[in-house]
Amino acid sequence: TIRNGLDELGYRDGDLAADLARWEADTIVPRDAVIPTLEDLLWQSRQRVAAVMYDFSSEWMEPVGVTQKPFAAYCDYPRRKVLLNLDFPYTVYALKHLATHEAFPGHLVHLGLRERYVADGSMPLDGAQVVTSSASSTLFEGIADNGMAFLDWLDTPGDQVAVALQRLRSALRCNAAWMMHEEKKTIEEIVPIIAAQGYQTTETVRGRLAFLHHDLRAPFVYAYWCGDAAVDAVWKQVPPAERKRFWHYLYGTMHTPTTLARYWR
């Protein structure tokens, strides 16, 4: 849990919100070091993928800073770039998550494998597509969100806190979408609720929720949380000796959360 992780890290003054804020402040990467830090983490994740999963050592994703975008990070696969929104603060753990999510073993590896499989005929042509708001888009995000777990890269209490925090905030973005589209609340009403529950500033939350108005990005909001949960639930059942077979099953088939769990043996 977040509380246990913070205690282990020495942030144990008693108030969870204050301890978490202090830990995040202490691990924030300075803005001018964000891109170099992400680049280093991309190098590390690529090496780990080549060692235990797939050899993508000839592939690269160049990190590029952007501003005023409706996303934190975006995998521009055709141009092999990771666009990172520098309007937001990032801890080193958040950048580690983004390196694995957007590139190795996340979107870059997933899309690269689909391309290979379509080219050699082992996957039908529509397998190369990523369709917004489809059942398979959940797995597209779920694979990426479990990247650190696939690489056995959750090796510190800080990693554990960061993953728990990322999942909490992902769930809260689903709540925000429901409040906006079903309950018809304004963004001014939603932001303070999500900020308080997610232990973030209202400024950060307002920026993070901008994608709820974006035609392409908005439909993916539920895919992140649901996909992460779906992949994590099956991954926990996979013994180490079966990991390579599982990855082929996961990356090489257009799954939904239901089929992923139903047909894995």
Residues covered by each model-derived region:
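N-terminal maturation segment of proteins
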Residues: 1-265
